[in-house]
């Protein structure tokens, strides 16, 4: 049955194949996540992969409330912002959930940012307190001192800093009585900045409750998880994909969340085997490492039943390789964007009652939401199988960009549609295929060349372990596609061999004109290729 309707404006709107469900949007995020805690209060909630310490659901809920009281004691009030500058750790969870109980906002920053980047975000978000680790204190010390901010450390606190235990030892009954509105902001991630400057994305209690429910609630949940599951949390929690689809979804269903501080293939496999991990939310770089590393074969990974990856091209051969490594897993993709809360589409093979899916699709629009595909030039909605800009509407999308109404208006139109800047199409089976970023298309004499398509081809070559394609200026064509390629271990593949491999498979204007061999392809924490860095290298004339 086709899930599409036409509106009075002539818009063709696509919906999930799953029926809409009741979503308790009135609940604050913490109340929603812990709503069914009585069913699993003594079960493991967080497992710290670094030291094997296990926190039960009762521990996590109580500690989060203690942290809320502790933050309040330090002067943090409702609608204030705290900055969490941490790698994955139980304290990250306690800080985020604690702020929610208080009606405060968490802005999450990558601890590997430069001091200037951290300070920029702390300033822009008006953070009133910073939670970090001793090794990162130097990045914020001067700013915190100049602005009279408390810095809290989760490990040995240097002079002038407060130890995290001061928060966890507070009396949970001291949380002030706050009335949280569903439209209040709870999380303030900064969008990746792959286009323009990073901006604070205001995600509300209602938005995140809706997004989690769209994934894991309902009789036939789109992303089926339960309290017997063990989720691998290796993606950084400061990124919304991990925060939402791993932490918040995991808490909602009562699953055990196994926290890994950073990806290391050996430790990763050891933890999967030891704790019998069942669900693996990954990004393409991790999928690539799993598929191409011989180490993986030494471990029993048969417990994994779900492997989901972000919507970047994996390529058919890569998918097949992952299937061999995880013999019992369903492999599929989701599609997200920070501003959309972040999940727009989710693979229906992950549903409790699964659907058949096609290789390369990145899911079907989530339930309780609407999607349309529009012509980027005219704004008119397009029928099935025609690529255009993906737009989404629903309660899960951001409230807007912090202090940037102009950027908000450019992104969310008057009808409430969020314009993603991604190009894709919906096929006859309601599956979404991403063609590319609107802003990343290469224009060869007016022909559109999608980098993602060429990258998928390159990744299928056995002697290529990673690749990125970007435009290079060309006098005659305007732009031509060039590739940055990482050779597989021991390979001595040449530029001509790479070019020939691609040219046999594509139309003339998609042929790669130059190949630059590099050690690594630069990527954001969420796994997106940092194309602007590669373009800058080309412009500077130093491609390698």
UniProtKB/Swiss-Prot annotation:
GO function terms (MF aspect): (E)-caffeate-CoA ligase activity; 4-coumarate-CoA ligase activity; ATP binding; benzoate-CoA ligase activity; CoA-ligase activity; trans-cinnamate-CoA ligase activity; trans-feruloyl-CoA synthase activity
Catalysis performed (reactions): (E)-4-coumarate + ATP + CoA = (E)-4-coumaroyl-CoA + AMP + diphosphate; (E)-caffeate + ATP + CoA = (E)-caffeoyl-CoA + AMP + diphosphate; benzoate + ATP + CoA = benzoyl-CoA + AMP + diphosphate; (E)-cinnamate + ATP + CoA = (E)-cinnamoyl-CoA + AMP + diphosphate
Tissue-by-tissue expression: Mostly expressed in flower organs, with highest levels in corollas, and, to a lesser extent, in tubes, sepals, pistils, stamen and ovaries. Also present at low levels in leaves.
Nucleotide-binding is among the record's keywords: yes
EC number, UniProt record: 6.2.1.12, 6.2.1.-, 6.2.1.25
Inducers of expression: Circadian-regulation with peak levels occurring late afternoon (e.g. 3 to 7 pm).
pH dependence statement: Optimum pH is 8.5 with cinnamic acid as a substrate.
SUPFAM superfamilies: Acetyl-CoA synthetase-like (SSF56801)
Summary of the knockout phenotype: Normal benzenoid scent profile in flowers.
Location in the cell: Cytoplasm, Cytosol
InterPro entries given in the database record: AMP-bd_C, AMP-bd_C_sf, AMP-binding_CS, AMP-dep_synth/lig_dom, ANL_N_sf
Gene Ontology CC annotation, any one: cytosol
Keywords, ordered alphabetically: ATP-binding, Cytoplasm, Ligase, Nucleotide-binding, Phenylpropanoid metabolism
Subunit structure: Monomer.
Protein task: Catalyzes the formation of CoA esters of trans-cinnamic acid, 4-coumaric acid, ferulic acid, benzoic acid and caffeic acid.
Homology family: Belongs to the ATP-dependent AMP-binding enzyme family.
Protein name: 4-coumarate:CoA ligase 1
Gene name of this polypeptide: 4CL1
